[in-house]
């Protein structure tokens, strides 16, 4: 029997950018902090720039996926975001809800990092997936050990030598049992412990250096991940 039920994920946060800058980031700038979304055309059912945006996709049998952003200006060039992700999960409702909720917190944290450190800079986006062996339980910790950040906490500065990639001077801007964020002077590295949600470990690279090469980046990091999960 298909477990088909509606869900709603609500997240409230403050962001280091004006509503206008947040609006730009969540509409046209998603490769800078999440992933490209232009391959999924959505109908904007509400578009009141820069305060209220609702984007919705619909499918057969009543399926839908909807994102709502409500933005309020705050002092100091900041904004308050009220975010609501709603829709229908068709299988493993509890597992999908858990995964989507935790990804939401990490993505919106990354949005804040982008707005604070790289807002408006051109980005080269790269998505890399680890081998299928990374779906096993407890393997995200193996990645942290291979990177050299297993003992590091959020806010720590680290000097890393990544096999096949090179040296990274970074701040650990996010770290928990499922996700890791590293920020260098010109790049955001996002690591996803999706093994906890039944999928391989993955990562994204958001390169603001002006010299990014998605193909070379993908090759280097894929080689590293293959060694970690050999």
Language model features with spans:
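Intrinsically disordered, low-complexity segments enriched in polar/charged residues with Gly/Pro
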Residues: 1-3, 57-58, 101, 158-159, ...
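Hydrophobic ligand-binding cavity/cleft-lining segments
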Residues: 1-39, 96-150
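Terminal targeting/leader modules
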Residues: 2-4, 8-16, 20-29, 41-44, ...
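Ordered, small/hydrophobic-rich secondary-structure cores
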Residues: 8-88
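Short, exposed beta-strand/loop patches in secreted or surface proteins that constitute
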Residues: 39-48, 71-72, 149-152, 168-174, ...
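Beta-strand/loop substructures that line and gate deep hydrophobic ligand-binding cavities in soluble
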Residues: 56-102, 173-230
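Acidic, Ser/Thr-rich low-complexity intrinsically disordered segments
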Residues: 123-186
């Amino acid at each position: 029997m298909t477990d088909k039920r509606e869900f709603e994920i609500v997240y409230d946060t403050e962001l280091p950018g004006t509503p206008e800058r947040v609006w730009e980031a969540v509409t046209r700038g998603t490769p800078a902090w999440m992933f490209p979304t232009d391959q999924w055309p959505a109908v904007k059912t509400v578009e009141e720039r820069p305060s209220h945006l609702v984007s919705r996709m619909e499918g057969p049998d009543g399926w839908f996926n909807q994102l709502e952003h409500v933005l309020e200006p705050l002092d100091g060039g900041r904004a308050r975001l009220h975010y609501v992700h709603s829709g229908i999960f068709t299988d493993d409702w509890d597992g999908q809800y858990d995964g989507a909720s935790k990804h939401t917190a990490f993505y919106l944290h990354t949005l804040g990092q982008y707005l604070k450190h790289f807002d408006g800079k051109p980005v080269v986006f790269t998505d890399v997936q680890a081998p299928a062996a990374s779906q096993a339980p407890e393997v995200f910790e193996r990645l942290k050990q291979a990177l050299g950040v297993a003992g590091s906490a959020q806010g720590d500065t680290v000097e890393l030598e990544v096999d096949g990639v090179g040296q990274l001077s970074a701040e650990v801007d996010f770290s928990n049992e499922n996700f890791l964020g590293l920020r260098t002077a010109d790049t955001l590295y996002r690591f996803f412990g999706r093994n906890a949600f039944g999928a391989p470990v993955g990562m994204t690279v958001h390169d603001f250096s002006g010299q990014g090469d998605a193909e070379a980046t993908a090759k280097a990091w894929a080689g590293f991940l293959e060694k970690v999960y050999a």
